[in-house]
Amino acid sequence: MKKIKYLVLLLAMTIFASSCSSGGADSTGTSNTENKNYKIGISQFAQHGSLDNCREGFIKGLAESGIVEGENLTVDYQNAEAATANANTIAQNFVGNKVDLIAAIATPSAMSAFNAALDTEIPLVYTAITDPVAAQLATEDGKSTGNVTGTSDILPVEEQLKLMREMLPEAKTIGILYTTSEANSVSMIKLYEELAPKYDFTLVTEGVSATADIPLAADSILEKVDVLTNLTDNTVVSSLPLILDKANAKNIPVFGSEIEQVKIGCLAAKGIDYDQLGVQTGKMAAKILKGEAKASEIPFEAIESPLTYVNAAAGANLGIEIPQTVLDQATESFDTIESK
């Protein structure tokens, strides 16, 4: 009988010790994520090179942090096809499916996801957002406005103006096509308006509300300018091949905002590496998924050093000789124009 009582007591003590050990791990706020499978939703606003690079970089950043698609990560990727209504539906579906995290690529998708997840515990990580403050995703001091964080692709506007002036010393008028409903584009227009006179440029802008407006808007603005420069405007960038064709027909150079635009025929750009921006964002998302930080605790980040890209073939087609000083500072220079 004593032996039986002893065994019962020993079993009870073992169970109690095991329970205490488990509770101790939870109380420290740490957890074993090695065996956890994550489910995330990626909402990309439009299909074009810079956003595609951002998405691919995001997946790489997660993988470098030990969260690998096909192993411990399931990705539900959706493209809004440059339609805000689609972005809203995608975000609502992600919330309904109770994903572990929403990744939003470009401002309209981020704003849709933020609103959809507002009353949930689902964190939002955004990327390719030019102005998180204007999009109400961050405060002026960089802090989050909710369970949200991410990275900004704010354009180096002054550096772009310097590059344009160096390459086109006789140019007087810059044109910008932009989507009136994209907060990121509106913010950049204001910055161009402020800085263009400093480099002896006059600015002409033409707003569109949808992709269908772009052919006529491009025809209109090309009658008024010496050069076009692109923003990270999703609707406009999606139609860049059309814009380039129209500009080339009038022998008007087009400056891009990142590498993919220069590859397909823009003359040059001061911009960022969207693949690297995506990697940076993926690593932020991994910290949140692993419980190492909350989205609300991480200020948004940006890549500070712009890169220089030039396309010598585009210059030759336009009869523009690229200064050696520009070639010397170029991160990459292209001798061909990729098919669009």
Give the positions of each predicted feature:
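Hydrophobic alpha-helical segments within soluble ligand-binding/sensing domains
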Residues: D131-T173, I272-A293
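Beta-alpha junction/loop-to-helix N-cap segments that form part of ligand/metal-binding clefts
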Residues: N79-T139, D233-N248, I252
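C-terminal motif of bacterial Sec signal peptides marking the signal peptidase cleavage site
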Residues: I15-S19
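An alpha-beta-alpha
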Residues: I40, F58, T149-A196, P299-A314
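Flexible loop/hinge segments that line or gate small-molecule binding clefts
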Residues: S112, A117-V157, S257-A268
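Hinge/cleft segment of the Venus flytrap/periplasmic-binding protein
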Residues: K287-K340
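Extracytoplasmic "Venus flytrap"
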Residues: K39-S65, D76-A85, S181-S185, T235
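Bacterial signal peptide processing site
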Residues: S21-G23
